[in-house]
Amino acid sequence: VSPPTVIRAARAIGFTGFTELKIEIARARGTAQFFAPPEVLTADATLASVLETSIRAGVDALTALSGAIEISALDEAVDLIQSARQVFAFGAGPSATVAADAVFRLRTAGVITVSIQDYLSAMIAARLLGPGDVIIVVSSTGRTSSTLSIADAASSAGASLIAITNQYDTPLATLANVSLVVGGMPLPAQMAAAGSRLA
């Protein structure tokens, strides 16, 4: 079967293309719990319940990643980072911890990376980026307004934008030079950062 035929078939059943279809298939084959609503932790949750929910969020994130991530996009992101003059990372809310974790991991690999937590400082830094610079922007939804503003400013300044998100068809994924879609069900706020950090 030719690639154009596969793409047309994917579009005919409601997907934007083969990549989106592939991600949905990976999600479906992951676990039976994948389509169940994620458990929301309550104030009276037991320690065992918190532990089980945390482990399940991690397993689901890694299962989704195994079928969702595009190796070619990951290769492109690695190339951009390795050749970058400087690397910045930004995420808002729960995504800030994922961005900070990415910075830590890149630093341990010898890549000088900066995470800027507050919006104003991040906006100033984004506007000062230029060609040869990379900004990694993390957003589970790909629609957070502050994150999109930072991404747009960095992109307008000429920096390469790597998006880490859960969905393809978002403003952030559209704006990015490289989108690393890690897939997975949206998680409650308490679990979102933990699952995304693992992925």
What spans do the regions from the language model cover?
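Short, charged beta->alpha transition segments
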Residues: 49, 72-77, 121-125
